[in-house]
Amino acid sequence: ELYTMNIDGTDVKQITDELGYDGGAFFSPDGTKLIFRSSRPKSDEEIKAYKDLLAEGLVEPTEMELYICNSDGSDLRKLTDLGNANWSPFFHPSGEKILFSSNFEAERGFPFNLYMIDLDGKNLKRITHGETFDAFPVFSNDGKWLAFSSNRNNGGGRDTNLFIAEWQE
């Protein structure tokens, strides 16, 4: 589950309360919203598999979608319904779009590319076009730069490096 609290550990508030694996949350630039990824089992078979793994202290986050809510947990809604793993969300500095990593177009679970989507779940746009792993996008506060992790240009290995790109609207 997701919680918020003051930096000194006081005023702990639970944000989510549903069966599943919630995490990777970020606040919007104005602090009024939270974006996060979640794996929420629905069928009896999925629920059993999830609980069996959880009993061993494990999770299998292969099916994840993005969720958005107000910073107090109200108005929770699913932002994506793309399938596969949609994760590593981050707000555009305008607060009106989300950049995230996904393999929803992949047939074999790979590659992961970066995508952008409006807060209403519309206007999905692919940002990177590779056959590698692109994830963990973070904008500079002024929106001029994008930092992200990728295993591109590494000679076919799995080492992940940090890339910084000038952002073009």
Where are these regions (language model features)?
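Short loop/turn segments that connect beta-strands within beta-propeller blades
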Residues: 6-10, 70-74, 118-122, 167-169
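Hydrophobic, aliphatic-enriched repeat segments that assemble into extended interaction scaffolds
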Residues: 24-39
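Residue-level detector of Asp-centered blade-edge/turn motifs that repeat once per structural unit
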Residues: 29-30, 93-94, 141-142
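CBM-like carbohydrate-recognition segments
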Residues: 138-139, 146-152
